Amino acid sequence: MGQTPRSAVWGRAHERHMAPTIFDLRNADDARDVIHRAVQALAEGGIVAFPTETVYGLAVSAPCAEAVDRLIHLKGRPEGKPLAVAVKSADDALDYVPSMSPLARRLARRCWPGPVTLVLDGSHPDSLLTQLPEAVRAAIMPEGTVGLRVPAHSAIIEVLRLLAGPLVLTSANTHGQPEAVSARQIADTFGEQIQMIVDDGPCRYGQASTVVRVADNDLRVLRAGVVSEQTLRRLCSMMILFVCTGNTCRSPMAETICRQLLAERLNCSPEELEDRGIVVGSAGIAAMPGGRPTPEAVEVMREDNLDLSRHESQPLTEPLVQHADFVITMTRSHKQAILAEWPSAAARTHLLNIDGMDVADPIGGPTEMYRRCAVQIREALSAWIDKFVA
């Protein structure tokens, strides 16, 4: 006789009216054991409840059509209302939406992991979504778009890393009822109809994710949630980040000159650039927070009617690198250091001088050295302005 399909195990469990097992992450002897149990349950076709930063969610393995079907019926979800797909990272999302627009990539980098679901075109022929069962594709993308999310909770992210394929994820409530924000609510609502609950206490926000439709370079909020539309539109801005060593002379001068050149090109004031969707900043690989610019740099900028006096240095951090659309370095060694630490930023990290020459460090030198440095920066930036406003 053949083996019983693993996905049938949970169906028999339901027939025996087995209550779901609740695993408390906060009091677990080894959280990894909880994660491995969840992975096994999902691989066998079970429905598992997970905490997220928004509300608790019900998840099934996306390749398991039977599990997806049971999830739909458990929720009482209307036909044609799509389920979301959880992936482990913004980079992973590109496997499912290879044609992701620059705006969508920008939002993915800046919002994930986090409480935003991006609704994107899922019809690309190279998408891994094409490998899912037809019934699953109908459930997650009935109109050709797919809602992707990277939840900001370590438990579900670790499960995604260990599981073969993404998760189909939906809020842990029946259709039309309030979302569950605790494990007890889930147990009371669904009882033995789900197989496992991962409990990590109340959810951080207690509110659903914001659902955003991104088409080309336009966005539309489909469902209000944790992240406001105003914040989302701010996150849509193009970010240019200049990097040097201490963030006290070269990179802040580049930031200030770049603001001036962009404002001239766009016929606005430097203060209005953010309203035009452009954010310009700077940081230093070895910078201390709150440092003042060198007096020579302030003086040289003042000669061009630019004010650098209020600048405060900041160290280069992972969020700055990941959020930036352009990371512009003063030297080749700065670029190498960034790529050694954050290799995923390679396509967005560039040397200021397109001819490959470094911008020499004027620190400790006379004012005239700072003037030459400013001239070099201005000349190099002239080749970048068209790219920034394209």
Q: Can you describe what each PLM-predicted range is?
A:
Residues 23, 148, 211, 308, ...:
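Short clusters of hydrophobic/aromatic residues that line enzyme substrate/ligand-binding pockets
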Residues 237-323, 386-390:
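Conserved active-site segments centered on acidic
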Residues 75, 262-266, 338-342:
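Conserved hydrophobic residues forming the short capping helix/wall of the S-adenosyl-L-methionine
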